[in-house]
Amino acid sequence: IRCFITPDITSKDCPNGHVCYTKTWCDGFCRIRGERVDLGCAATCPTVKTGVDIQCCSTDDCDPFPTRKRP
């Protein structure tokens, strides 16, 4: 499977059986810069924590950088 990986946001091969994920969350600069974004691959979908949104998928390049919502 190929997944986009941060910080370069380039598509790279991941080991067999892994899933792609997009993780977003707010930090102290969220109002100015928008949500923080982490793209990658993992053996299993990461555990969701309070204030963190995680989306997992299992097809090539299914985790593009999310578009930002405009105010």
UniProtKB/Swiss-Prot annotation:
Pfam families in the record, alphabetically?
A: Toxin_cobra-type
User: What CDD domains does the record point to?
Assistant: TFP_snake_toxin
List the cysteine pairs that form cystine: C3-C20, C14-C41, C26-C30, C45-C56, C57-C62
**What are the GO MF terms of this UniProt record?**
acetylcholine receptor inhibitor activity; ion channel regulator activity; toxin activity
Q: Which SUPFAM superfamilies match?
A: Snake toxin-like
The protein's location, in the record's own words, is: Secreted
Work out whether the entry's keyword set contains Secreted.
yes
Query: Could you say which tissues express the protein in this record?
Result: Expressed by the venom gland.
Q: Which UniProt keywords apply?
A: Acetylcholine receptor inhibiting toxin, Disulfide bond, Ion channel impairing toxin, Neurotoxin, Postsynaptic neurotoxin, Secreted, Toxin
Q: What GO terms fall under cellular component here?
A: extracellular region
- Asked whether the keyword Secreted is assigned, the reply is yes
Q: What InterPro entries does the entry give?
A: Snake_3FTx, Snake_toxin-like_sf, Snake_toxin_con_site, Toxin_cobra-type
Function, as annotated = Binds with high affinity to muscular (alpha-1/CHRNA1) and neuronal (alpha-7/CHRNA7) nicotinic acetylcholine receptor (nAChR) and inhibits acetylcholine from binding to the receptor, thereby impairing neuromuscular and neuronal transmission.
Q: What family is this?
A: Belongs to the three-finger toxin family. Long-chain subfamily. Type II alpha-neurotoxin sub-subfamily.
The protein here is known as Long neurotoxin 4
